Amino acid sequence: MSLGQRLALLASRLQEPQRVASFQRLCGVEVPLSSPAADEDAETEVRGAPGEPRRRGRQPGAEDSPAKADCCGAPNGVRNGLAAEPGPTGPRRAGSQRRNSLTGEEGELVKVSNLPLYYLFCLGTELGNELFYILFFPFWIWNLDPFVGRRLVIIWVLVMYLGQCTKDIIRWPRPASPPVIKLEVFYNSEYSMPSTHAMSGTAIPIAMFLLTYGRWQYPLIYGLILIPCWSSLVCLSRIYMGMHSILDVIAGFLYTILILIIFYPLVDLIDNFNQTYKYAPLIIIGLHLILGIFSFTLDTWSTSRGDTAEILGSGAGIACGSHAAYTLGLSLEPSLHMLPLAIPPLTVTLFGKAILRIVLGMLLVLFVRDIMKKITIPLACKLSSIPCHDIRQARQHMEVELPYRYITYGMVGFSITFLVPYVFSFIGIS
């Protein structure tokens, strides 16, 4: 057997849904014998195209696929609640009985016998969700180091955009259920290869280490511990949730390493261009919009298209906001002779200002997001002559979803790097 055949055989085995199900059982996740899902295991399965795993029902990425509903804490109108028999090992609704904001779909009833692992992997999967991003990047920009925060966003946008587009090109379905138990339905309508959670969970800690080591004074061992812990937690959480095969996660990890090798040397150049070039905002907005339109042509409707527009809008807004802040002198960064920076001692005053900035800043950001959401969807429907009485259906049109996500999160990003720092400077807490 040649090397190529061996690698193909290995990849085929790593893609098997039975391996995902085995990992779930090892971690204490099972379908209760009395649940409807257990009774359905014997139902007839639908066989896909050659080389694809067996699966039932709707295919991920299809037009009538459900939109997403997070596992542990995503926004977008999900609902929390307790399932019947909520004991430590009793049946519970996957994702704490979360309901999909666009279709009303809920996770299936499952039995979790290892709650510490359940909550640990919920934390891991949240490290790749909107709630985390909307807290993490502003915290860096407002409280820690805007220089690092801006560059983290550039890397995140590159990695996530390439990952989402690759999914829509390869079009591999999610692991078949059964045997896999879907603990999450938020991303169930998207394709599987590669895992963009694994990509962001690999890119962010590596980029944090590369950007901060030498700029800040801290032991090298901290970074060497952070990277494998963060990345492995996110990667394993996607297998635990039943969202990805082992192959998806490994491919996402390796794909991210390749992207960082190619693009990381350009990050300084991109950030300097965003801040200093006179016509940077026009180029940023136009380029990100073109990339968004291209991604929308790769496949029929799925929730990943809206995510891609959201990522591009956020990146464009943060870049334009950093340009405005630099132009008006709001970007106060230490000179090169002050490097490496010493980590200041944590005092009551420092902690209080940090909490005040994050609370006040997030209130302003969420206010901007809600206002823009209420404006952009009806306006996009009106301009496109699409009925807006059914928001779920309207958002399946590119003419509505792309401008809604792009403009709304573009303003969110602009607020993070310009409007909020301007308010901080005005009231004296910058």
Swiss-Prot record:
Enzyme Commission numbers on file: 3.1.3.-
GO molecular function, one term: dihydrosphingosine-1-phosphate phosphatase activity
Catalytic-site annotation from UniProt: H197 (proton donor), H244 (nucleophile)
GO biological process: ER to Golgi ceramide transport; extrinsic apoptotic signaling pathway; intrinsic apoptotic signaling pathway; regulation of epidermis development; regulation of keratinocyte differentiation; sphinganine-1-phosphate metabolic process; sphingolipid metabolic process; sphingosine metabolic process
pH dependence per the UniProt record: Optimum pH is 6-7.5.
Transmembrane regions listed in the UniProt entry: 121-141, 152-172, 193-213, 216-236, 246-266, 279-299, 311-331, 348-368, 409-429
Catalytic function, reaction form: sphinganine 1-phosphate + H2O = sphinganine + phosphate; sphing-4-enine 1-phosphate + H2O = sphing-4-enine + phosphate
Cellular compartments annotated: Endoplasmic reticulum membrane; Cell membrane
Main location: endoplasmic reticulum
Record protein name field: Sphingosine-1-phosphate phosphatase 1
Gene behind this protein: Sgpp1
SUPFAM superfamilies: Acid phosphatase/Vanadium-dependent haloperoxidase
Record GO cellular component, one term: membrane
Gene3D superfamilies, per the entry: Phosphatidic acid phosphatase type 2/haloperoxidase
